[in-house]
C-alpha cells in the first residue's frame, strides 16, 4: 500500500527526528557520517539559506531532504546554486515514492527562489530521473 505523505518545510520540532531517520535510512556504516553532515550544515552560516523538507505520515517524520547554498563565482559573476544532500527515507517507507516527492518539492521551491544550479551527492542511478547528470564518469 502506497503512503500519502505530507511534504512541508522542517520546523524546530522536527530536528530531533532527523538524525534518527538518517541512522535508520543509512545504517551504522554510513549513518554516523550522514548525521554529522546534517549537524554541520545546519550550523554552517555559509550554507545558508537552507531548504530542509520533511515528509510526514500520520504526524511521524518518515523522510527528509536538505538543500544548502553553494557559492559559485565563474568569471566573477555569482551563480545561485544549491547542494542536495542528504536525502533519507525510513526503511519501512522506501520504494513508495517519498524520496522522489521530497526531491521534486525541493527542486520546485528552489526554482521558484531563482536557484540556477543544483548539485547532488548521492546514488548515481537514483538522481538522473530528476534531470541530474554525472559531473564526470570513471
Residue ranges and their predicted role:
Residues 1-5:
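Basic/polar N-terminal segments that are highly enriched at the extreme N-terminus
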Residues 6-18:
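A short beta-loop-alpha structural element at the N-terminal edge
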Residues 19, 25-73:
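Active-site rim helix/loop that mediates acceptor-substrate recognition in acyltransferases
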Residues 27, 130-138:
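Conserved acetyl-CoA-binding loop of GNAT-fold acetyltransferases
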Residues 70-83, 94:
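A conserved beta-turn-beta hairpin within the catalytic core of GNAT-like acetyltransferases
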Residues 84, 89, 95-108, 120:
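Conserved acetyl-CoA-binding loop-helix of GNAT-fold acetyltransferases
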Residues 103, 107-122, 133-135:
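Conserved GNAT acetyl-CoA-binding A-motif
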Amino acid at each position: 500500500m502506497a503512503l500519502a505523505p505530507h511534504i512541508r518545510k522542517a520546523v524546530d520540532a522536527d530536528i530531533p527526528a532527523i538524525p534518527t531517520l538518517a541512522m535508520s535510512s543509512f545504517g551504522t556504516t554510513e549513518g554516523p557520517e550522514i548525521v554529522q553532515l546534517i549537524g554541520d550544515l545546519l550550523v554552517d552560516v555559509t550554507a545558508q539559506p537552507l531548504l530542509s523538507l520533511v515528509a510526514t505520515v500520520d504526524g511521524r517524520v518518515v523522510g527528509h531532504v536538505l538543500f544548502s547554498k553553494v557559492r559559485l563565482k565563474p568569471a566573477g559573476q555569482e551563480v545561485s546554486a544549491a547542494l542536495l544532500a542528504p536525502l533519507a527515507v525510513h526503511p519501512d517507507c522506501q520504494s513508495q515514492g517519498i524520496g522522489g516527492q521530497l526531491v521534486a518539492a525541493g527542486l520546485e521551491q528552489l526554482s521558484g527562489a531563482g536557484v540556477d544550479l543544483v548539485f547532488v551527492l548521492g546514488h548515481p542511478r537514483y538522481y538522473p530521473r530528476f534531470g541530474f547528470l554525472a559531473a564526470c564518469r570513471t
